[in-house]
Amino acid sequence: MILKNISLLIILFFSISTFSAGHSLKNISITVVAPATGADNKTLSDLKNINGLNLQISSKCFAKGKLPFLASSDAVRFNCLRDALFDESDNIVWSLRGGYGSARIIPDLLKLSKPNTEKVFIGYSDITALHLFLSQEWGWKTIHGSNIADLLKPEQDQGNFTKLAEILKGKVKQVTIDNLVPLNDIAKSSDLVNGKLTGGNLTMVQTSIGTSWQIKTKGKILFLEDVNVAPFRLDRELLHLKQAGLFEDVKAIIFGSFGKDLDATMLVLRNFADSLDIPVFKTNRFGHEKINDPIIYNTNSKIIKSKEFKLVMGL
């Protein structure tokens, strides 16, 4: 009986949290896109049934292709994303989830002319590939933030969506990432760092190297996060970025969460920070863990020090 009551309380808490997050997004029209991995019918149905959400989810965009880890074929995923980005409505274009597949449709995106109207585009993880394309090729200010399916994850802080809603509704003039911890001496002595933001998922940033959509880091504040990365692999990926010249003329680096941030992971990050002559910071405020605060590509930003270091993004 006790276990049953606990289970009921957990379900009730999750339902209340999901309702609260959904309510914060009330009256915001959202077109859901799946440029990477898809979801089963139950997940899509559960999203549609969240009270207060105005989601447009086209069933044609979830017709399974030959590869089971993709939402649909490359052609279908591209067409659905293109239609959402070029739609003349003021709908927010919000990625369903990450997984894998976004990079596969970039060659087709490169053939398109920039739309007349800039859309608000949200997502993270594998969606980093699209952020790099949209921010670099079209000059858009896209938002690195929770995918819409994260509304259904009880382990996610639903405040992630409250903060996104405040941005979408124009309730805030700036966005902040708090609790930046300096990892090297040059970061500790920094008072002000200015620059526009780029970055995202480390695996996808590494994947971009040598492609037509390779990340452009010069003069930027670079933010990076990842999940399920063994410490030796993390060191290898960061070394690849360094040897590829991606840290040259970077204003600063901000590391988000890397899984549970084990002692070995932090050792890798601190050791790597010490090898660079640019400020390097660490925070747990964005990434694949519970908290995933929004970060805006291409916006004028600054790292400032008051009582602590924080990132401030203008809107």
Locations of the language-model features?
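Internal helical hairpin/lid segments
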Residues: 213-265
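Short Gly/Thr/Asp-enriched flexible loops that form oxyanion-binding sites at enzyme active sites
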Residues: 98-116, 132-134, 267
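ATP/nucleoside-binding phosphotransfer catalytic cores, i.e., glycine-rich phosphate-binding loops
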Residues: 257-315
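Sec-dependent signal peptide recognition
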Residues: 2-9
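Conserved anion/nucleotide-ligand pocket segment
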Residues: 141-204
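N-terminal signal peptide c-region/cleavage motif recognized by signal peptidases
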Residues: 15-17
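Short, acidic/small-residue loops that bind anionic groups at enzyme active sites
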Residues: 111-133, 141-147, 277-280
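ATP/NTP phosphate-donor binding region
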Residues: 20-89
